[in-house]
Amino acid sequence: MAAAQPESRDGAAQSAKPASETDPLSRFTCPVCLEVFEKPVQVPCGHVFCSACLQECLKPKKPVCGVCRSALAPGVRAAELERQIESIETSCHGCRKDFVLSKIRAHVASCSKYQSYIMEGVKATTKDASLQQRNVPNRYTFPCPYCPEKNFDQEGLVEHCKLTHSTDTKSVVCPICASMPWGDPSYRSANFMEHIQRRHRFSYDTFVDYDVDEDDMINQVLQRSIIDQ
């Protein structure tokens, strides 16, 4: 199995993040679809997206980068990153077989054990529809789940936790997920630091329609997942 490669110029803004210390594959993960990059493209601000994901992000009249919120523009092919994706291996979380990163997306689309693994995660983080009656929560500022500090925006909470609580192993509720329509305010993440650095590197406001009911939202996510595969 190929070892992790030294930092490259392609995607350097992502690979330099501490998340790579807890998940060595994080620098090969698109911040939009959360899958291994497919035809990676580096935009002017330095972040990298799948080509198809970037095209979706560019559709608004004034597109912004979902990671840093700077103005978004078409980028250039991340050739070195693409080369590494063709050579580095990883294991399927379902069947545990090894594949090069470029093949893992196609594999998990048809792996029944991986689908079972994903559905268990969905059940753990999705509220029962019968329990959805509650007031619309504040989705703009969040408290730290580890300490009394509060009123962080999403990016501020990520940075605060990385700087202050990177070694804290306590299971906590993710305040960002708990505020979402599908969130479970009682679900405790076993590895919150890895979760927040991978799942919340971009702003949900850029991609999520909060007015869509949960069933429609889940269907949209599943359809997009199939298309991305």
Swiss-Prot record:
SUPFAM superfamilies according to UniProt: RING/U-box (SSF57850)
PROSITE patterns xrefs: ZF_C2HC_RNF (PS51803), ZF_RING_1 (PS00518), ZF_RING_2 (PS50089)
Region (Disordered) residue spans: 1-23
Domain of life: Eukaryota
An annotated GO cellular component: cytoplasm
Zinc finger motifs (RING-type), residue ranges: 30-69
Residues where N6-acetyllysine is found: K103, K113
EC number assigned by the record: 2.3.2.27
Reactions mediated catalytically: S-ubiquitinyl-[E2 ubiquitin-conjugating enzyme]-L-cysteine + [acceptor protein]-L-lysine = [E2 ubiquitin-conjugating enzyme]-L-cysteine + N(6)-ubiquitinyl-[acceptor protein]-L-lysine
Cytoplasm keyword on record: yes
PTM description: Autoubiquitinated. Polyubiquitinated in the presence of E2 enzymes UBE2D1, UBE2D2 and UBE2D3, but only monoubiquitinated in the presence of UBE2E1.
Binding residue positions for Zn(2+): C92, C95, H107, C111
Biological pathway: Protein modification; protein ubiquitination
Subcellular localization(s) per the UniProt record: Cytoplasm; Nucleus
Zinc fingers classed as C2HC RNF-type: ranges: 92-111
Predominant location category: cytoplasm
Molecular function GO labels: ubiquitin protein ligase activity; zinc ion binding
Record flagged with keyword Cell division: no
GO biological process: cell differentiation; protein polyubiquitination; spermatogenesis; ubiquitin-dependent protein catabolic process
Keywords: Acetylation, Cytoplasm, Developmental protein, Differentiation, Metal-binding, Nucleus, Spermatogenesis, Transferase, Ubl conjugation, Ubl conjugation pathway, Zinc, Zinc-finger
CDD domains: RING-HC_RNF114 (cd16540)
Purpose: E3 ubiquitin-protein ligase that promotes the ubiquitination of various substrates. In turn, participates in the regulation of many biological processes including cell cycle, apoptosis, osteoclastogenesis as well as innate or adaptive immunity. Acts as negative regulator of NF-kappa-B-dependent transcription by promoting the ubiquitination and stabilization of the NF-kappa-B inhibitor TNFAIP3. May promote the ubiquitination of TRAF6 as well. Also acts as a negative regulator of T-cell activation.
Complex and partners: Interacts with XAF1, the interaction increases XAF1 stability and proapoptotic effects, and may regulate IFN signaling.
The name this protein goes by in its record: E3 ubiquitin-protein ligase RNF114
Organism: Rattus norvegicus
